[in-house]
Design a protein with these regions (language model features):
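A short SAM/SAH-binding and catalytic strip from SAM-dependent methyltransferases
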Residues: 117-131
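A short glycine-rich, Lys/Arg-flanked "PGG" loop and its adjoining helix->strand segment in the class I
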Residues: 134-146
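Class I SAM-dependent methyltransferase SAM/SAH-binding core
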Residues: 59-106
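Conserved alpha-helix/loop element of class I SAM-dependent methyltransferases that forms part
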Residues: 22-39, 56
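Conserved class I S-adenosyl-L-methionine
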Residues: 151-173
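A short acidic, Gly/Pro-enriched loop at the edge of an enzyme's catalytic core
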Residues: 105-118
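Class I SAM-dependent methyltransferase Rossmann-like catalytic core
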Residues: 2-26
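Conserved Class I S-adenosyl-L-methionine
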Residues: 193-244
Length: 245
């Protein structure tokens, strides 16, 4: 049975940028309905990238809410923090969003118990080793105030519909069961899991363009060309974990 959820399909007229904007706008809604935000809330976004989630999230919150956006902006993400800075200036959000270039395993310049909420999306998959994950979770715990919460989203390892079309099968470093154990070790409690059921379907041309931005090799295109032409690409859902300090 097909699971219910919005399916966004980019077309040549609007391009993938518009589709991704819709996707992250709805993902921000999913996150914000699951966290308690007060007028004085301080949010730290770990691994903010180029602000795909940062911008729609802060725009939906009261103007008194502050957000610290943290990213190392190195390797495949080089320059992304600079791109986010430009977006913040264009959106007039300079007074509400503070950018911090730092490794999330040791966040410099953020005091103990200074944030109410830690948010991240597609971050923990970039920390595939146990020691890397433990350092990041311990750092999030350090930064959060007592009673504060952490929420993290990541693509599920399961495609939306089995047996129909060509799917992206994501292999996350950590599934919800594993994250339950590691967050508990870090001191977190009240662990919960939800699912963000929106997805994106890419036709052949938009799929090729999108996959190139992910650094997909030419050998991949050659091997899967027939499937891509016939089915395009469909992204998996996200599992969203949250817990409290």
């Amino acid at each position: 049975m097909r699971r219910k959820g919005l399916r966004l399909t980019p077309n040549r007229a609007e391009g993938t940028a518009r589709t991704w904007s819709k996707y992250y706008d709805k993902l921000a809604d999913h996150f914000l309905t699951r966290i308690r935000v007060k007028p004085s809330t301080v949010i730290l976004e770990a691994g903010c990238g180029k602000g795909q989630l940062t911008i729609p999230m802060i725009q939906k919150l009261p103007k008194s809410v502050k957000l610290i956006a943290v990213d190392s902006s190195i390797g495949p993400y080089l320059g992304w923090l600079d791109e986010l800075e430009s977006k913040i200036h264009r959106s007039g959000l300079e007074s509400r969003v503070h950018l911090l270039r730092s490794d999330v395993r040791r966040i410099k310049g953020v005091k103990d118990s200074s944030a109410d909420i830690v948010v991240s999306n597609e971050l923990l998959c970039d920390l595939p080793r146990k020691d890397q994950l433990a350092k990041a979770l311990n750092e999030f715990y350090r930064i959060l105030r007592p009673g504060g919460s952490m929420i993290h989203g990541e693509w599920s390892s399961s495609p939306v519909d089995h047996g129909v079309g060509f799917k992206v099968k994501h292999s996350p470093a950590w599934n919800p069961d594993q994250l339950f154990n590691y967050t508990k070790r870090a001191g977190f409690h009240n662990f919960r899991v939800s699912y963000f059921t929106e997805t994106v379907d890419f036709g052949y041309n938009t799929a090729i363009a999108e996959l190139r931005t992910w650094g997909v090799t030419e050998s991949f295109f050659k091997h899967y060309e027939r499937s891509l032409k016939r089915y395009g690409v469909q992204l998996p859902y996200e599992h969203v974990i949250q817990c409290e300090k």
